[in-house]
Structures are given as structure tokens and as C-alpha cells.
Regions:
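Catalytic centers of hydrolytic enzymes
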Residues: 1-287
Length: 287
């Protein structure tokens, strides 16, 4: 304060443990009906899965977890290429019954699904930017593979160990490509073909499925990576869902009844022996 005038201020927040507190009885009584309705909804059966889906493997290559989302996005959006990232560090959806509550592990945020027009060059640049924040340039097979902060072991929570948020680690489906861990940023991605073996062209325009956070510029993959001006992003959108993506994922699972999620194996890190060795070192730091 300078007299009665505020000249500067600083606000800090922190998480507070409230487990030891007793909930207010009037509050609990007032909202008891809504609480029971919400609990019933999250316990509703959506379908069944023949395999366990985990998010941790997604940091090291194709995974059933992310590739199921890719498959759904390609199908729902009638797209040629899909982009998706692990939205949770340690999500697990066990084999067996899938309930509504599990869908919040599979897809945490209230994003719409967009389909946007991107050129082949923009797709490559998008992926270069994604992996630039995901993996480091390895000098030998004993290096870390993931782009951690210095001394990652000092951080208690796995998400704090990364230099960039893991929800910006987009991989792609619909195309076959490699990510060279020995190359610098901008030279890592080699797109071999479309997933069906058809040629991939840097000059052709493709229908690309991605969530609305990403499509509106979130994470910078479109603006800083693909070099699309923010003012142009809305012009690239050619289709959008009306409801959140989780709703459509639920509808697809209900429609199929039983799903069998497996990795699509459309991309990989190379050299493969370096990636395998680095995974043994890095995976404990992701859990």
C-alpha cells in the first residue's frame, strides 16, 4: 500500500487437504438427490473391453489407449489423419466392464472433435513440434529418451518431471512415420506413407481429426508448429461435433458392445534398440 492506494499485489494458491473435515450436514442434505443421480450415472455400464488400456505406454510408442482414441476420431470425423495425446499420466481402464466413470480416465476434458484441413507439410511440422517437447535428442543409447527437467527424480509427481505438459504430446494415426531420436528438432519425422500404403504428399491437403483445444491453438502445435496464424484456424475447421468427444466415444462403445483395443503400430521411435533401452530407464519416472 501507498497510503490508501494499492500499488502492487501478489496472490498465491495452494492445495489444502480437507479429508479430516466433516461435510456440512445442511449442504449434504440439500444436494443429496443430485449426488445420488451423479453416482448412478457414473456407475452406468457402457460396454466391455477385451484388453486393458493404460496411458503410460503411450509415452514410448503406439498404445492401445491412444490408438483407440485415434480410431474413434478417424471414424467419427471421417478423417484421413488423427492427432491425440495422453490426457492423463497414469490412467488405467482394466479389461472387462467399462463404466461411465472409466470414460473420464479415457478422455478427461470437455473437448469437441474438430476436423480441419491441413497440408502434408503442416502435418509434418505439427509432429516435429509435438515431439520436440516430448523427447530429447539422444547422444547414445544410455541417454534419457523423454524430455525431462534437470534432475527429474527430485519432483514428487510424475507430471512435474516433464519440460512440457504431456497433454501436448500428440501422435498421429492414419499415416506411417518414424521419429529419429538421434536427430535435432525439425529433422526427426519421416512420413513413409498413408496407413493403407498410399503415397503421402507434403503438398496435398488432408482431413485431420483433433480436439477443439488443439484446434483453437492450444499447445501451439498448429500455430508455432504448423505455422498457421491463429486468425486462420477457424477457417480451417470443416466439421465439428455438437457435443463433447467423450459423449461420442461412449456412444461408439455402446454401439459395438465389446471393444478390442490394440496398438495400431503405425509409427515408431528409431533407433529401436536405443528406444527400448531408454524406456527401461525412463518408464519408472513416468509412473
Amino acid at each position: 500500500l501507498n497510503g490508501k492506494k494499492v500499488v502492487s499485489k501478489k496472490v498465491e494458491g495452494s492445495l489444502v487437504d480437507i479429508d479430516h473435515l466433516t461435510p456440512d450436514a445442511d449442504f449434504m442434505k440439500t444436494f443429496a438427490t443430485q449426488f445420488e443421480q451423479g453416482k448412478k450415472f457414473t456407475n452406468d455400464l457402457v460396454g466391455k473391453s477385451q484388453n486393458t488400456m493404460e496411458s503410460v505406454p503411450a509415452f514410448f510408442g503406439p498404445s492401445a489407449f491412444i490408438d483407440f482414441i485415434h480410431q474413434m476420431q478417424l471414424q467419427i470425423g471421417k478423417a484421413e489423419v488423427s492427432f491425440a495425446a495422453p490426457l492423463a499420466m497414469d490412467a488405467v481402464i482394466p479389461e472387462g466392464n467399462i463404466y461411465v466413470r472409466d470414460m473420464f480416465n479415457l478422455y478427461r476434458y470437455e473437448n469437441l472433435l474438430y476436423v480441419m484441413n491441413l497440408t502434408g507439410q503442416e502435418i509434418k511440422d505439427y509432429l516435429e513440434y509435438s515431439y520436440s517437447g516430448w523427447v530429447k535428442q539422444m547422444e547414445n543409447k544410455d541417454d534419457h529418451m523423454l524430455l525431462f527437467r534437470d534432475n527429474p527424480e527430485q519432483y514428487a509427481d510424475a507430471w512435474q518431471r516433464f519440460q512440457r505438459p504431456s497433454y501436448n504430446f500428440d501422435s498421429a494415426a492414419g499415416i506411417r512415420y518414424t521419429v529419429d531420436l538421434t536427430k535435432p528438432t525439425g529433422q526427426r519425422i519421416t512420413i513413409l506413407s498413408m496407413a493403407d500404403g498410399q503415397p503421402f504428399s507434403l503438398t496435398r491437403t488432408y482431413r485431420c481429426a483433433l480436439n477443439s483445444y488443439r484446434g483453437n491453438g492450444g499447445g501451439g502445435l498448429l500455430t508455432q508448429g504448423a505455422h498457421i496464424p491463429e486468425s486462420e484456424l477457424t477457417k480451417r475447421i470443416i466439421w465439428s461435433t455438437e457435443k463433447d468427444l467423450r459423449y461420442y466415444l461412449m456412444q461408439e462403445i455402446k454401439k459395438q458392445g465389446t471393444i478390442n483395443p490394440k496398438p495400431l503400430n503405425q509409427w515408431k521411435f528409431i533407433p529401436e534398440d536405443w528406444a527400448a533401452t531408454a524406456r527401461q530407464k525412463d518408464e519408472p519416472l513416468v509412473k
